[in-house]
Amino acid sequence: MKKSYRVKREKDFQAIFDGGKSTANRKFVIHFLEKEQDHYRVGISVGKRIGNAVTRNAVKRKIRHVIMEFSDHLKRDDFVVIARKGVENLDYQEVKQNLQHVLKLANLLEEGFESEKKH
């Protein structure tokens, strides 16, 4: 994921938290701020309650991969994905399903988007 697609600075995170809206499911919270820009920007937060650094980084990699997979269908807003306790035990498909669910709740995925389901 290119740097221009990331929310990195504290003031950007704070603007999203203060001026935006949020929605959640059991595994993720998404804070988002509607903004007119060329592309979406995403910040990922995985707290120390999730596990050690290796575990947290593995969770972040899964989230990043799912976001990149959905990238063509995401609205051009800023958003922050916060992982909740229990996400460290999910496999990639479960992370994908949960993220897709919460992105739809936040109305950040384009209308009519359905990812292919692998069984």
Curated annotation (Swiss-Prot):
Domain of life the protein comes from: Bacteria
Protein's GO biological process: tRNA 5'-leader removal
Keywords associated with the record: Endonuclease, Hydrolase, Nuclease, RNA-binding, tRNA processing
Reactions catalysed, as given in the entry: Endonucleolytic cleavage of RNA, removing 5'-extranucleotides from tRNA precursor
CC annotations in GO: ribonuclease P complex
Residue spans crossing the bilayer: none
Enzyme class of the recorded protein, top EC level: hydrolase
The keyword Isomerase belongs to this UniProt entry's keyword annotation: no
Keyword RNA-binding: yes
MF terms (GO), sorted A to Z: 3'-tRNA processing endoribonuclease activity; ribonuclease P activity; tRNA binding
The EC number(s) this enzyme carries: 3.1.26.5
InterPro entries assigned: Ribosomal_Su5_D2-typ_SF (IPR020568), Ribsml_uS5_D2-typ_fold_subgr (IPR014721), RNase_P (IPR000100), RNase_P_CS (IPR020539)
Pfam families attached to this UniProt entry: Ribonuclease_P
Record function comment: RNaseP catalyzes the removal of the 5'-leader sequence from pre-tRNA to produce the mature 5'-terminus. It can also cleave other RNA substrates such as 4.5S RNA. The protein component plays an auxiliary but essential role in vivo by binding to the 5'-leader sequence and broadening the substrate specificity of the ribozyme.
Family note: Belongs to the RnpA family.
Subunit description: Consists of a catalytic RNA component (M1 or rnpB) and a protein subunit.
NCBIfam families, A to Z: rnpA
Protein name, per record: Ribonuclease P protein component
Lineage: Bacteria, Bacillati, Bacillota, Bacilli, Lactobacillales
